[in-house]
Amino acid sequence: QVVPYEGAATGVGGILRDVLCMGAKIIATADPLRFGNPNGKDKNRVKYVANEVINGIAGYGDAVGIPNIGGDVYFNDSFDENCLVNVVCLGIVKEKDIIHSFAPESAEGYDIIIVGKATDNSGFGGAAFASLILDEKDRESNRGAVQVPDPFLKNVLIRATYAVFEEARKQGIKLGFKDMGAGGIMCSTSEVCSSSDFGAEIDLSKVNVSMKDLPPYIIANSETQE
């Protein structure tokens, strides 16, 4: 509802990460969608949101090279002020090749390697935003919680990640791999480490950033889909 094009696009980007990080080859997506009444009191807004959502899904999916093979759509007054954009992702991986989102038992002394889009201030507060009751008067202030999508970079990252996984399997290297979702670096690093009873030292000055003078708490907690 806040920025429907970007919101839908990053929804696709997020679900692709979830499946990719398990070591799977992504093969398709699908989208069950719920919108408000296109003939009701908010019909103009509903139609605008629906069009932007569809364009966002198509724009990200086409650029990243993953086909959308299905979904469904329903319209109801209950979704006038808060649409629902569900995203499904299908991937294929052999059970023995599944990669987990926690550090292996032998990971003492391992480095944490962060790959992807340079960190900026977009997506900061995304986890809290996801739990908010949306209010139209807060629309502008909520924009910063939604990331700016870059599906062409995501396409490159997916292919590079496939290559990393293949090389790790060939060399017998055990690793943990996790997408950097809401909460950014702080969330993903703590989850990867704590699940295996490890701690980690995080030097934020070594994080690649695209904006000058970002406060440490922004670097630590911002999020993008790439």
Predicted regions and their residues:
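Glycine/proline-enriched, intrinsically flexible loops and inter-domain linkers
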Residues: 1-226
